[in-house]
From Swiss-Prot:
Signal peptide: none annotated. Residues 253-265, 273-290 have a biased composition (Polar residues). Its main location: nucleus. Residues 1-134 are annotated as: Globular head. The coiled-coil region mediates homodimerization. Belongs to the XRCC4-XLF family. XLF subfamily. It comes from Danio rerio. Residues 297-309 have a biased composition (Basic residues). The lineage of its organism: Eukaryota, Metazoa, Chordata, Craniata, Vertebrata. Homodimer. Interacts with xrcc4; the interaction is direct and is mediated via a head-to-head interaction between N-terminal head regions. Component of the core long-range non-homologous end joining (NHEJ) complex (also named DNA-PK complex) composed of prkdc/DNA-PKcs, lig4, xrcc4, xrcc6/Ku70, xrcc5/Ku80 and nhej1/xlf. The record marks L114 as: Leu-lock. DNA repair protein involved in DNA non-homologous end joining (NHEJ); it is required for double-strand break (DSB) repair and V(D)J recombination and is also involved in telomere maintenance. Plays a key role in NHEJ by promoting the ligation of various mismatched and non-cohesive ends. In some studies, has been shown to associate with xrcc4 to form alternating helical filaments that bridge DNA and act like a bandage, holding together the broken DNA until it is repaired. Residues 243-252 have a biased composition (Basic and acidic residues). This is Non-homologous end-joining factor 1.
Length: 309
C-alpha cells in the first residue's frame, strides 16, 4: 500500500472552507487517506472489518454487506479528495472538525434512499511517513527543476551563438521589436530574486500544487528520474539521440570541404592519366579541338559554395 500511495500526487482540496492537500487511495476493500495543512499531517487507514464496524455504528438503520458500504463510500469520498468543484461533489455533504491532534472529515450522503454517514477519523502521521510522502519528493523536485533551468539556460546560450553567427554573416531582423539582448544567466537569476519573486507573493503556507507539479511529483516519487530524467525535453532519450545526430551532422558538414577538395583533386589526377593514355592510342587532335576541350574542362570545374554566398 505504501508504494501505491507514494505514486499518487498531493491534490489541493477545500473541505468545508478549509484548504488542504490530500492524498487518498481506495482499493478493493480498504483505503488510506493523508491530509495536511502544511502545519500537521493526518492519516487514516481502514480495512474491510473496520469499515463494516464503523458503517454499522454510524448507520443504525442500514443493513448491507461491507462491500456495498465500501462501494458507496468510494463513490462519494473520491471526489471529495480529488480537488473537484463543489458542484461535482454534490452527492455528499462534507464537514471538517479538528479536536486537538485529530482531524475528522464527516460525509453525509444517501444510500438506498436513506441517509448514509461516514467519518474519516485521522490522527497525526509519524515523521517517517511525512518524510517519505512529502519532504523527500519535494526536495527531489527542486533538484529536477534546478536541472531543468540549467538546461534552458544552456539552450538560450546556444541560441544566442546561432543568432550572432547569422548577424556576422549579414542577416538583419525584419522587425526591430523582435530584437533581444544576449541572455546572461547570472544577471537573470539576480533580477528574478530581487524583482520578480517579490511580485509573486509566494508564502510558506501556499497550497498551490497544479497539474504540472503533480505530474513531476509522481515521476520523481515513482523512481523514473533515478539515473535518467525523462521530464525535461532536453534530457529525454529522444532529445539526447537528436543531439548526438546533430553533432554528427555538424561534424560531417565541417569535413565536407576538405573531402570534396580531395575528391576533386583525385578526380583531376584520374582524368589527366586517362587523357594521356587516350592521346597515346589516338591521333593528335587539331589545335582548335584542343582549345575547345580545355575550355570544356574549365567549365566543368566545381566551385565551393558555403552557407552564406
Amino acid at each position: 500500500m505504501e508504494a501505491v500511495l507514494s505514486a499518487l500526487p498531493w491534490v489541493p482540496v477545500n473541505i468545508s472552507g478549509s484548504d488542504l492537500l490530500a492524498k487518498a487511495w481506495f482499493g478493493d476493500s480498504q483505503y488510506r487517506v493523508l491530509l495536511t495543512d502544511l502545519s500537521t499531517v493526518w492519516e487514516e487507514e481502514m480495512s474491510t472489518d473496520d469499515i463494516q464496524s464503523r458503517a454499522q455504528d454510524l448507520n443504525k438503520r442500514l443493513r448491507a454487506p461491507a462491500q456495498a458500504f465500501f462501494s458507496h463510500l468510494c463513490s462519494v469520498a473520491r471526489p471529495c479528495f480529488s480537488g473537484l468543484d463543489e458542484d461535482q461533489i454534490s452527492a455528499a455533504q462534507a464537514a471538517l472538525e479538528q479536536h486537538g491532534e485529530s482531524l475528522t472529515v464527516k460525509l453525509k450522503s444517501e444510500l438506498a434512499g436513506l441517509p448514509f454517514y461516514w467519518e474519516f477519523r485521522c490522527t497525526t502521521t509519524p515523521v517517517a511517513v511525512v518524510c517519505r510522502q512529502l519532504v523527500r519528493p519535494l526536495l527531489a523536485m527542486t533538484l529536477v527543476l534546478q536541472r531543468q533551468a540549467e538546461d534552458l539556460a544552456a539552450l538560450l546560450a546556444r541560441k544566442d551563438a546561432e543568432i550572432q553567427d547569422y548577424q556576422e554573416n549579414g542577416a538583419v531582423l525584419s522587425r526591430a521589436r523582435l530584437q533581444t539582448e544576449p541572455f546572461e544567466v547570472h544577471q537573470y537569476k539576480e533580477n528574478f530574486i530581487t524583482q520578480i519573486l517579490p511580485q509573486m507573493n509566494v508564502t510558506l503556507d501556499s497550497l498551490g500544487f497544479d497539474s504540472e507539479l503533480q505530474a513531476l511529483y509522481m515521476a520523481v516519487n515513482s523512481g523514473k528520474t533515478g539515473r535518467k530524467r525523462k521530464h525535461s525535453p532536453d534530457s529525454s532519450p529522444a532529445a539526447q539521440e537528436n543531439h548526438i545526430t546533430d553533432h554528427q551532422h555538424i561534424s560531417e558538414s565541417t569535413d565536407v570541404g576538405p573531402s570534396l577538395a580531395s575528391q576533386e583533386h583525385n578526380n583531376a589526377k584520374e582524368s589527366g592519366r586517362s587523357q594521356v593514355a587516350n592521346s597515346q592510342q589516338t591521333l593528335p587532335l587539331s589545335s582548335t579541338a584542343g582549345s575547345e576541350d580545355r575550355s570544356t574542362s574549365r567549365a566543368k570545374k566545381k566551385k565551393a559554395v558555403g552557407l552564406f554566398r
